[in-house]
Amino acid sequence: MYTKADAAYIPFAWMNPELAVILPVYAGDHPDYLREALESIVRQSLQNFILVVVEDGPLPEAITQVLNEYKDEMQLLQHSQNQGLATALNTALDWCEQYKISFLARMDADDRMRPERLEMQLDFLNLHEEVDVVGCALEEMDTQGRPRGKQVFYPENHHECLRFFRFRDPLPHPGVMFRMRFFQKAGRYDPGLRYNQDTELWYRGFLNGAVFANLPAVLLEFRMTEAFFATRRAGKARARQLLALRKEINKGLGFGPEARLFARGMFLLALLPAGIRKLAYRIFR
């Protein structure tokens, strides 16, 4: 939970927004990528929203300068020390709940939104009252922001999202929009998890009756870097945590032997060199 000492407040009551975009930032982010992310947010076709940025610990001057360029566009919350992604997201959720925000869009500091993303997702949720969280398709881009020639689509309805979850996450975490009630059903992000916080959140969502959906439109430009392949589900600690989580998911949601076999395969893949993981990602993404 943040305190007034940890947060910089701006007056926004006149806006009366129902939607917030949540953007965590930490020292490891790239300032140029962050600028692109922020620019894509402020240029949305839908303008009645508030941007909530969480500074997760001390930041380099280059990142601070980028944030200062957009200081009039955001609500800034600050952690005096780095506390991790889950805690940063929970800080934003607590603030949004306090100010009775109804819808929350996720965004990462190295990706870009298509201009129509917020408008399309909010329109969808307003038309489908039963849905608690909606994702979208994404297009991969390289470190220079150029298309890599690959688009990724996710299941559109709840039933197919649940089936898809036997093997992979059914939504792109930086491309989702939640109703606040999703977190009333599923709870907050687990700060005790160093990895796979989104996977664990989806599990609790399914377990507690949240309804999932995806739009078949490319609304997120997802940046692929060598660091992404080097760290994605890599290392023994991450592999063990993922395997344990997948075992819990398979048991809790009643997934069959094919899901258990896939979980073991993911565990072994995480122990292989980055080059092999990169090849597997390109094949199975």
Which residues does each predicted region cover?
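Nucleotide-sugar donor-binding/catalytic module of glycosyltransferases
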Residues: 2-234
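Non-catalytic, C-terminal membrane-associated alpha-helical segments of glycosyltransferases
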Residues: 230-285
